[in-house]
Amino acid sequence: MAGSLYIISAPSGAGKTSLVSKLTEKDSRIQVSISSTTRPKRPGEEDGVNYVFLSVDAFKQKVAENDFLEHAQVFDNYYGTSKSVVESKLAEDKDVILEIDWQGAQQVRKLIPDAVSVFILPPSLKELEKRLRGRGTDSEDVIERRMSDAVNEMKHFNEFDYLVINNHFDTALSELHSIFLANRQACAKQYEKHSVMINELTQQH
């Protein structure tokens, strides 16, 4: 038995983190892959819970050892998804979510073509800006950069298998969960799980 790998991408402010957090509360089979990073630990963060915190040298060593499904440099910090961590979770029949951008999604799909990908969109640019401002943590320059980055990110929505519009949170959560539930009923997945029963049902007497 093995779980499925899911890629979930969205522009900053679309509500991806909140949706994924509620989804994992709702369905115990779904887990989020913990990324590795070289950025400094923030107050309240725990190593191995929020991120795996690595030195730059240790991160580059893992790149050299081909231990990342995808990795990228964001400003002055490196981020990556550990191949071994993801594989161990999938082997436990967990559905694993990678919260990565469109570039990371492209890298992962090359390695794991049957990964299921979902893109989350805000209902409008006006609403996206409102959500970014509502955080109250970013300067005007940062908000402008995030809005510009968001437009570039959203141009890649059609590279994904599914699209969820986060207009009403509960509706978007239900739609996102339905993707996971439907994928578990895929013929190949069901046969893997119930092969003995199905073979018995389809034997000629």
Swiss-Prot record:
Top-rank taxon: Bacteria
Binding site for ATP: 10-17
Residues covered by the Guanylate kinase-like domain: 3-181
GO CC terms in record: cytosol
Main localization, broad class: cytoplasm
UniProt cross-references to InterPro entries, sorted A to Z: GK/Ca_channel_bsu, Guanylate_kin-like_dom, Guanylate_kinase, Guanylate_kinase_CS, P-loop_NTPase
Subcellular location: Cytoplasm
Top enzyme category: transferase
SUPFAM superfamilies listed in its UniProt record: P-loop containing nucleoside triphosphate hydrolases (SSF52540)
Alphabetical UniProt keywords: ATP-binding, Cytoplasm, Kinase, Nucleotide-binding, Transferase
Cystine pairings recorded for this chain: none
One function term, GO molecular function aspect: ATP binding
One Pfam short name: Guanylate_kin
Record has ATP-binding as a keyword: yes
Function: Essential for recycling GMP and indirectly, cGMP.
HAMAP family in the cross-refs: Guanylate_kinase
Annotated family: Belongs to the guanylate kinase family.
Name recorded for this polypeptide: Guanylate kinase
Organism of origin: Hydrogenovibrio crunogenus (strain DSM 25203 / XCL-2)
Encoding gene per record: gmk
